Amino acid sequence: SKTPIHLYRHNVFVDLVRSQTGIWGIFAGVLLMASLYNLLLYFGIKDRVYLVYIGYIISAIALMGTVLGFGFYLWPLEWQLFIHEKIIVVNYTIAFFTLAFCTMFLRYHKDRCWRYKLSVGLLWLMLVLGTLSFFIPENIAAPIFFVILGLLYIVCFILIYNKLKSGFRWAKFYVFSWVPLIIGAAIQPLELTGVITYSFSIRHAFLMAILCEIVLMAMALADRVRYQRERALYHATHTQQTKLLNSAKLKYAFMALKAQQRSTTLCLVKIRHFNSLNTI
């Protein structure tokens, strides 16, 4: 690490602390509000993906609170020191929830295909290695984690690409959420190794990237709910075998015409031995 040491005048330092506190407060406030909101959604919808999303948010707060230091304002000193000592475990936690959210959001737990089994296998591997990291020195656990991180990106891209190829257009916000995460994750090590010159914005680039990612993930969840409602309405108004409007939709349309007192003629035709449009 090539973290620089800067000497500030008193007024400049006060402005720096004020700016840092402000951006930390925005980050923690937005994420905590998102957690509470999604907890309410879980109680209403009973979809476990919201619990996974909350787990990811809490892990992100713990990670950034330890890396940047604002965790001292959020929880007791003993907790902050313990999290700092077990920072690799926190990294495994956020990686675990990242893959779990990707799997459940894209509904692979419904498909049970080989991609789902690949995801579950990596989740179990991260769970085991994360547990072992409580007892392994950081200088040994860190290189292992970076290997797992590479596998995580590969598996997530496989899951996302397959769904995009099959027409999961409502997942566009989730795909976009990976862009700031990848950019922010690349900037932080470049800054720590001296490749990129240190600045206030560079120092907090990963924090802002996570904030943008979580906002886009929330938008993706909202888009997912909208899609599920549209599908539920479609199934309620269409016959699954023929893909044609069913009697419920016909009754609704006919009653609407009657309410408008419009002259209407209803003609019913029965086709024998008809199962689908392909049999005509």
Each predicted region: which residue ranges?
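Conserved nucleotide-binding and Mg2+-coordinating catalytic segments in signaling enzymes
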Residues: 232-252, 269-279
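Interfacial "cap-and-anchor" motif at the non-cytosolic start of specific transmembrane alpha-helices
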Residues: 59-104, 109-233
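Extracytoplasmic
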Residues: 1-43
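Juxtamembrane interface at the cytosolic side of transmembrane helices
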Residues: 36-59
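Hydrophobic core positions of alpha-helical segments in small-molecule transporters
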Residues: 29, 52-55, 144, 176
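Cell-envelope/extracellular polymer assembly enzymes that use nucleotide-activated donors
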Residues: 265
